[in-house]
UniProtKB/Swiss-Prot annotation:
Topology with respect to the bilayer: Single-pass type I membrane protein
Lineage, opening ranks: Eukaryota, Metazoa, Chordata, Craniata, Vertebrata
Extracellular topological segments: 26-205
Protein name: High affinity immunoglobulin epsilon receptor subunit alpha
Domain of life: Eukaryota
Transmembrane intervals: 206-224
Amino acid sequence: MAPAMESPTLLCVALLFFAPDGVLAVPQKPKVSLNPPWNRIFKGENVTLTCNGNNFFEVSSTKWFHNGSLSEETNSSLNIVNAKFEDSGEYKCQHQQVNESEPVYLEVFSDWLLLQASAEVVMEGQPLFLRCHGWRNWDVYKVIYYKDGEALKYWYENHNISITNATVEDSGTYYCTGKVWQLDYESEPLNITVIKAPREKYWLQFFIPLLVVILFAVDTGLFISTQQQVTFLLKIKRTRKGFRLLNPHPKPNPKNN
């Protein structure tokens, strides 16, 4: 009976530790998100950093780190109000005993125009948004976006650039120009890098379900085999018992007489 108990355990372990999309279902690092989603902001603006977990543990408190120093904030959200230059730098968060998040870098500027991006490093296939932002949200007209020194897009009224599926060809140096109060201004350049998506996950999406199917097949096979063995042993036992009932007294051996 032992084999029948061991294999379901293996199957359960596989189902617990592997998610349907082929990713290990173990506690992952938390991730810091920004709202608004720009990591380059003007002095005096507000931004909220949120430490997003994966709900593996019930989060009771959060640790925030700014440039390596522990913050007094223990909530899952860190509010930066009336941003100062000192608020620039690296931010990380941590939930309980889970590893620290990957760092997020915030930059505080004082300028007339600021090119903002949803991310400076983008995974291939992910969306990318660019914004030519005016100081104190002042209107910007005759906006031109540039990539690697060449004009990319022009609008008389300011609009964002939306790239639905970023490719490695979208990597480059971006900046924007525009008019604020009838004066021409140019933003600081921003380097955008699009990296290729890792290929390992694709084969994992096929391997993990296959592993579960194999474990299930082994589990079923062992269960059937064990059932057959038990049935066979019970049949032998019943046969021997029936034979003893039909022959309660053994026949005498003539040689002993």
